[in-house]
From Swiss-Prot:
Subunit structure comment from the entry: Homodimer.
Gene3D superfamilies: Lactate dehydrogenase/glycoside hydrolase, family 4, C-terminal, NAD(P)-binding Rossmann-like Domain
Keyword Mitochondrion: yes
Sorted UniProt keywords: Mitochondrion, NAD, Oxidoreductase, Transit peptide, Tricarboxylic acid cycle
Positions contributing to substrate binding: R114, R120, N152, R186
Upper classification of the organism: Eukaryota, Viridiplantae, Streptophyta, Embryophyta, Tracheophyta
Residues annotated as binding NAD(+): G41, A42, A43, G44, G45, I46, G47, D67, N127, I150, S151, N152, M261
Location, primary (coarse class): mitochondrion
Annotated GO MF terms: L-malate dehydrogenase (NAD+) activity
InterPro entries tied to this protein: L-lactate/malate_DH, Lactate/malate_DH_C, Lactate/malate_DH_N, Lactate_DH/Glyco_Ohase_4_C, Malate_DH_AS, Malate_DH_type1, NAD(P)-bd_dom_sf
Protein name as catalogued: Malate dehydrogenase, mitochondrial
């Protein structure tokens, strides 16, 4: 089971990511760099399965699990798994510094999940404060770490983090990345089902933001090509945008998309680790500081990952008329979310 899960994590990375045999060729198992990964919010609905998946990742040598409560149990449980990384649990604000010190990658799934009837403002007001506090600690204890932001609303929490790091004098736009991988995972799954092609062969870039209409899957660039009707493309786009709501409703108020989000977060963290370790041509979609759209200081698109985090923000490429229209529609909403985050951070 362990071997199959490891294969799954590796095989579902971006099509540009190297296969395991290429990874071994790049550096032997005995010379894989030491990498510490910290998960903040590790006892939560996303944090626990994410901790499990990161424990299975052979690129991780130290796994630090932090939360305000419950982490010793999660760490003890995950720590019994016979993989490379050493696991330590940290609980409470007084131990946050220990969890962060020496981290190469910090993953932040901390915060409250979305519940039925919860507005975006409700979610923002709670999670924004949590992110602000955690990023203040990151700036102090591991200012050079690559930060993977999962906490929603990502369209606002990434700008919040950027402002906190700027105030601390530690901001590096190459090392702050909003995790939008779940949108890509969903787009691939839904496209494969409609096009009737093997899902492991599918690649679909998703650009824009990470909420509602700001999520813009570029099915015109999907691989392999399929001649889907316009109605099908519109339906696939809508389902990708509403994927989170679909899960919240299916769980009838008892949860959100925790498992698929943990999977997506593990995929993205794996890509970041490969980039840090010098594996070539690692490309993923991410919400980062960008100049692709003039009005938007942050934007999700394909990025090339490397030893410094984001090595290059890639151009959008050719888009269909439907996608161009979607891009125009999302710009004002995404701009408002970004500005809301910046305003909160500077209050």
């Amino acid at each position: 089971m362990r071997a199959s899960m490891l294969r799954l994590i590796r095989s579902r990375s971006s099509s540009a990511a190297p296969r395991p045999h290429l990874l071994r060729r790049a550096y032997g198992s005995e010379s894989v760099p030491e990498r510490k990964v910290a998960v903040l919010g590790a006892a939560g609905g996303i944090g626990q399965p994410l901790a499990l998946l990161m424990k299975l990742n052979p690129l991780v040598s130290q796994l630090a699990l932090y939360d305000i409560a419950g982490t010793p149990g999660v760490a003890a449980d995950v720590g019994h798994i016979n993989t490379r990384s050493e696991v330590a649990g940290y609980v409470g604000e007084e131990q946050l510094g220990q969890a962060l010190e020496g981290s190469d990658v910090v993953i932040i799934p901390a915060g409250v999940p979305r519940k039925p009837g919860m507005t975006r403002d409700d979610l923002f007001n709670i999670n924004a404060g949590i992110v602000k506090s955690l990023c203040t600690a990151i700036a102090k204890y591991c200012p050079n770490a690559v930060v993977n932001m999962i906490s929603n609303p990502v369209n606002s929490t990434v700008p919040i983090a950027a402002e906190i790091f700027k105030k601390a004098g530690t901001y590096n736009e190459k090392k702050l990345l909003g995790v939008t991988t779940l949108d890509v995972v969903r787009a691939k799954t839904f496209y494969a089902g409609k096009a009737k092609v093997p899902v492991e062969e599918v690649n679909v870039p998703v650009v824009g933001g990470h909420a509602g209409i700001t999520i813009l899957p570029l099915f015109s660039q999907a691989v392999p090509k399929a001649n889907l009707a316009d109605e099908d493309i519109k339906a696939l786009t809508k389902r990708t945008q509403d994927g989170g709501t679909e899960v919240v409703e299916a769980k009838a108020g008892k949860g959100s998309a925790t498992l698929s989000m943990a999977y997506a977060g593990a995929l993205f963290a794996d890509a970041c680790l490969k980039g840090l370790n010098g594996v070539p041509d690692v490309v993923e979609c991410s919400f980062v500081q960008s100049s692709i759209i003039t009005e938007l200081p942050f934007f999700a698109s394909k990025v090339k990952l490397g030893k410094n985090g984001v090595e290059e923000v890639l151009e959008l490429g050719p888009m269909s008329d439907y996608e161009k229209q979607g891009l125009e529609i999302l710009i004002p909403e995404l701009k408002a979310s970004i500005e809301k985050g910046i305003k909160f951070a500077n209050q």
